[in-house]
Amino acid sequence: KEGKGVRSILFFLPEKIQDAKIVNYLVKVENPLPGYDIGLVCSEKSKIFYPHIDNVKLFTFNDEDLNYFDTIKSLSFMSQIKNKSYDAIVDLNTGFCAATTMLAFELNAPLKIGFDSTVNRKIFTITLERKENTFLESYFSRILSLLGAKL
């Protein structure tokens, strides 16, 4: 975006509770990043991991929105998200998640950040290699740094 950085970010929230605890702390869902237009995507099942998301734009999908391959088939869900154009998409799932990976593929954003996998290398502009002995906090801090955001 002409070197001005990102102003709007769509975060795909993790489906695993252990990752959700860290994301709640780092992304400060109770108090979203000041000065940024934030959107969040998660499944209805994982929504319970994020108790303080009333004050941000939240998109949730359920099992009926998914097809046989666990990717999003719901046109109404897709059109809700496509109503807004985001500068960046960040998938915070540390493992492969078919629904969010294919959603990232479908959406047009100049910057897409996710964790490394064979599929994600084709879809995301930046992938972060997950190392078992590295704390998740350092990855999330790096993501915010790549976005030009500060905690």
What are the residue ranges of the model-derived segments?
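Histidine-anchored nucleotide/phosphate-binding helix
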Residues: 11-12, 16-36
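Glycine-rich, highly charged phosphate/nucleotide-binding loops
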Residues: 60-80
